[in-house]
């Protein structure tokens, strides 16, 4: 291969597609990895609280249909989840989108509600908008990814807090009746 050998982290500062492969003795070993990196107002911004599992929420990489691909963030309990991103400066926001996977067989479903609040000082928050889902919308069969979008109404703020309420236990007619459903998010996108 005539490409340079990368021995340091590859810095990406805008949307682009990274293609990478492993070589030994000039021969490509395995397939080429194609990794689309998306960029938005939340990408690479600090997530407050330093929870290791939440680092994938704004790394610019979307998850696949396998919730085990290390791009999905999940929590030990999905009763109530809350995370805050610091945009580092006041930004105008029109839409907040969060990727959510449903894997019916594993009891992974979207939450009952998603609420977004904003702040200029990380002390006083004001609610902006909320999404709510019925059990019929939550406990759908199949494995699929949904982008759940919230109208931010042109709000200008520095801090954005997302709070979700879990869907609770899987219903009696579910393949996992009585098991607490889990939530998995892949990417927080603020436009």
Tell me the role of every PLM-derived stretch:
Residues 139-143:
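Short glycine-/Asp-/Thr-/Trp-enriched loop segments that recur within the blades
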Residues 56-59, 95, 138, 150:
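Compositionally biased, low-complexity repeat tracts
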Residues 127-138:
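Solvent-exposed serine/threonine-rich low-complexity stretches and specific carbohydrate-binding patches
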Residues 1-82:
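Short, compositionally stereotyped local motifs that mark structural "simplifiers"
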Residues 50-54, 131-132, 177-179:
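Short intrinsically disordered coil segments
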Residues 66-129, 144-191:
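Aromatic, loop-rich ligand-recognition surfaces of beta-strand-rich domains
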């Amino acid at each position: 291969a005539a490409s340079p050998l990368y021995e340091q982290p590859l810095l990406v500062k805008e949307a682009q597609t990274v293609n990478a492969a492993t070589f030994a003795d000039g021969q490509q070993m395995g397939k080429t990895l194609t990794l689309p990196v998306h960029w938005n107002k939340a990408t690479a911004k600090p997530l407050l609280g330093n929870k290791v599992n939440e680092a994938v929420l704004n790394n610019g990489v979307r998850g696949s249909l396998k919730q085990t691909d290390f791009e999905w963030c999940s929590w030990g309990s999905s009763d109530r989840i809350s995370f805050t991103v610091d945009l580092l400066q006041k930004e105008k926001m029109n839409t907040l989108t969060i990727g959510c996977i449903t894997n019916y067989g594993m009891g992974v479903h979207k939450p009952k509600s998603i609420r977004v609040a904003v702040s200029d000082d990380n002390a006083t928050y004001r609610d902006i908008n909320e999404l709510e889902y019925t059990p019929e919308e939550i406990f759908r069969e199949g494995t699929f990814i949904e982008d759940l979008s919230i109208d931010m109404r042109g709000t200008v703020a520095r801090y954005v807090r997302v709070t979700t309420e879990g869907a609770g236990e899987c219903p009696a007619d579910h393949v996992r009746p009585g098991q607490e459903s889990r939530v998995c998010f892949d990417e927080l996108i603020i436009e």
